[in-house]
Amino acid sequence: RAAAGMATPTLEAARRGLPNTLYGVSLLHEGQVIGMGRVIGDGGSFFIVVDIAVLPAHQGRGLGRRIMAALDDWLRANAPPSAVVSLVADGDAKHLYAKYGFVETTPHSVNMEYQVE
């Protein structure tokens, strides 16, 4: 996460959270993880795409699309028809996500969060 410019959870948070991943993708190059993404949620009504990241040295090669395609395939095969799939799109990544059916929800709703201290 840090190498891709994303916030890094504490080791304890990662130990608790990662086992609850519904589906995850890791892209490897010469034994090193260079890209990742995962789906979390309740497994029925709500699914959230998180942790989409590709190392800067490997960006611009379509790897983000490969990650999203794998997650999208899994969601379409496993989520029930009434399920809602959401994500937070940073910057121009919204254009990638739009290719998989994601639409902006603003101004009807906005992303809100807080970090536990």
Where are these regions (language model features)?
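Conserved GNAT acetyl-CoA-binding A-motif
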Residues: 68, 75-89
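Conserved beta-hairpin
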Residues: 22-37
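Conserved catalytic-core motifs of GNAT/GCN5-like acyltransferases
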Residues: 82, 86-88, 98, 103-117
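Conserved acetyl-CoA binding element of GNAT-fold acetyltransferases
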Residues: 45-56
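Short amphipathic alpha-helix that is part of the acyltransferase structural core
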Residues: 1-11
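Conserved acetyl-CoA pyrophosphate-binding loop and the N-cap/start of the following alpha-helix
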Residues: 58, 62-70
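A short helix-loop-beta-strand connector motif used in the catalytic cores of GNAT acetyltransferases and
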Residues: 15-26, 81-83
